[in-house]
C-alpha cells in the first residue's frame, strides 16, 4: 500500500515527505493550519488522475504554489506497494512566464525501478518491455499523460495502478449533503460524502454480499437497527430508508432524516464493506470523529483500524482526545508550522520527547517541532 508521499512547493508543503511503510493505519495531529488537510488535497490530485481527470488546471492552480513561488515546479511523488510490486509515480508541474495555466514539466511511472513510461514536457516515451523503448508520442503539455495511455490487459501494471488511484477514498463528510438518494451507481465516493447513495448502490450492485457487512456493523453500533432498503422511487432513482425495531414497534426513517452522527455510522459501514469486497483500499479520513458523541468515538476509530489491519490502509487526522488515544506513538505523526510563512514540518510522535501526558501537552500547545 502507500509507502511514501513526497510533495514540494505545493501550498504549505515544501520538501515534505510522509513515510508509511508497514503501517496499516496512521494518525496526523497538529494545530489548525499545520497542513493536515493539505496532505489530503495532494492525495486528491492523484485520485483525480486515476479517475480520468487530466487537465492540469482541474488538478492544480497557480494559487497552489507555496507563497506564490511559481519559478519552482510543484512536485508530487507517490510510492505504492501493490501485489508485491513497488509503483512510483512522479508528476512535476510548472508555470512558465506569461503562461496562465500550469503545464506538465515531468511525468514518470516506474514499477520495481523499471520505467513504464517517462515524459519531459510534451514528449512521452512508452516502454513495452522494461528498458526497451516501444513508442514515442506527443501529448498536450496541459494534459497529464497517465489517463491517456491505454492499458494492454487486465493484468497490465498501468491498469493496476490507475485502478488503485481511482479507488482512493478521501473523506471529509458534510452530513447535510448526504441525502441517501441515488441516480446511478459508482465505486468512487466524493470527499464530502454527498454521493453515498450512488456509492452504496454501486457496492451492492457489484457485491451483493456487502449488505451483510454493512448490516453487521450497524447492528453493533445501533442496537435497535432492523434493516435498510434502497427503494426504487422512479426510473434510475433510488432512496435509502432505514428501519428500526424495539419492543415489537417499528419505525422507518429516510436516510436524509438521520442525525449527522448516524449518517457517519453508515459511511463508516460502507467504507469497511468496500475495503473488504473491492479492496485493499487506501482511505484518508479528515477528522472521522466529527459529529460523533464522545462515547462513540473509541468504537468508531477502533473499527476502522481493525478493518484495515490485514488489508488496505487508513490515514486519519484528529483533534479529539479519544481518537488520538486509539493510536500508538509509532503510528502517530505530528505536524507543525512556526508561522504561515514557513512550511509544514512532520515527525513521528515516537521521536518526540513529551513532558507528561500527550493530551495535556496538546491542550496546552506544548508540542512543537
Model regions: which residues?
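C-terminal lobe/lid and adjacent interdomain/linker elements of RecA-like ASCE P-loop ATPase modules
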Residues: 298-369
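Phosphate-binding P-loop
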Residues: 17-23, 275-278
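N-terminal pre-Walker A segment at the start of P-loop NTPase domains
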Residues: 1-14
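The conserved Walker
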Residues: 32
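GG-anchored amphipathic helix commonly corresponding to the ABC/SMC/Rad50 NBD signature/C-loop
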Residues: 246-248, 256-285, 295-299, 307
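Conserved P-loop NTP-binding catalytic core
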Residues: 29, 38-102
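Conserved glycine(s) of the Walker
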Residues: 35
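Electropositive, glycine-dotted interaction segments
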Residues: 87-227
Amino acid at each position: 500500500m502507500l509507502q511514501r508521499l513526497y510533495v514540494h512547493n505545493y501550498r504549505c508543503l515544501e520538501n515534505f515527505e510522509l513515510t508509511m511503510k508497514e503501517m496499516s493505519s496512521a494518525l496526523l495531529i497538529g494545530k489548525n493550519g499545520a497542513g493536515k488537510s493539505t496532505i489530503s488535497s495532494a492525495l486528491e490530485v492523484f485520485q483525480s488522475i486515476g479517475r480520468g481527470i487530466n487537465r492540469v488546471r482541474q488538478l492544480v492552480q497557480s494559487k497552489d504554489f507555496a507563497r506564490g513561488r511559481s519559478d519552482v515546479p510543484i512536485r508530487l511523488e507517490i510510492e505504492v506497494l501493490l501485489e508485491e510490486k513497488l509503483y512510483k509515480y512522479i508528476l512535476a508541474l510548472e508555470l512558465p512566464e506569461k503562461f496562465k495555466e500550469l503545464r506538465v514539466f515531468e511525468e514518470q511511472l516506474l514499477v520495481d525501478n523499471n520505467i513504464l513510461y517517462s515524459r519531459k514536457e510534451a514528449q512521452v516515451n512508452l516502454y513495452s518491455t522494461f528498458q526497451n523503448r516501444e513508442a514515442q508520442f506527443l501529448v498536450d503539455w496541459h494534459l497529464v499523460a497517465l489517463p491517456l495511455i491505454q492499458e494492454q490487459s487486465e493484468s497490465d501494471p498501468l491498469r493496476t495502478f490507475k485502478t488503485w488511484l481511482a479507488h482512493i477514498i478521501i473523506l471529509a463528510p458534510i452530513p447535510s449533503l448526504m441525502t441517501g438518494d441515488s441516480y446511478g451507481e459508482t465505486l468512487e465516493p466524493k470527499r464530502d460524502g454527498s454521493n453515498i447513495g450512488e456509492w452504496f448502490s454501486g457496492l451492492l450492485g457489484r457485491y451483493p454480499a456487502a449488505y451483510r457487512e454493512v448490516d453487521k456493523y450497524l447492528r453493533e453500533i445501533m442496537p435497535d437497527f432492523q434493516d435498510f432498503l434502497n427503494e426504487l422511487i422512479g426510473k434510475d432513482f433510488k432512496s435509502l430508508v432505514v428501519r428500526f425495531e424495539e419492543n415489537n414497534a417499528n419505525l422507518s426513517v429516510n436516510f436524509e432524516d438521520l442525525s449527522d452522527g448516524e449518517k457517519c455510522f453508515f459511511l463508516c459501514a460502507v467504507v469497511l464493506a468496500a475495503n473488504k469486497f473491492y479492496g485493499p483500499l487506501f482511505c484518508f479520513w479528515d477528522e472521522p470523529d466529527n459529529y460523533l458523541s464522545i462515547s462513540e468515538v473509541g468504537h468508531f476509530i477502533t473499527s476502522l483500524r481493525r478493518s484495515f489491519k490485514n488489508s488496505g490502509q487508513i490515514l486519519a487526522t484528529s483533534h479529539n482526545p479519544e481518537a488520538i488515544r486509539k493510536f500508538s506513538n509509532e503510528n502517530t505523526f505530528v505536524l507543525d508550522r512556526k508561522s504561515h510563512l514557513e512550511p509544514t514540518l512532520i515527525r513521528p510522535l515516537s521521536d518526540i520527547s513529551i513532558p507528561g501526558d500527550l493530551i495535556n501537552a496538546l491542550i496546552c500547545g506544548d508540542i512543537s517541532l
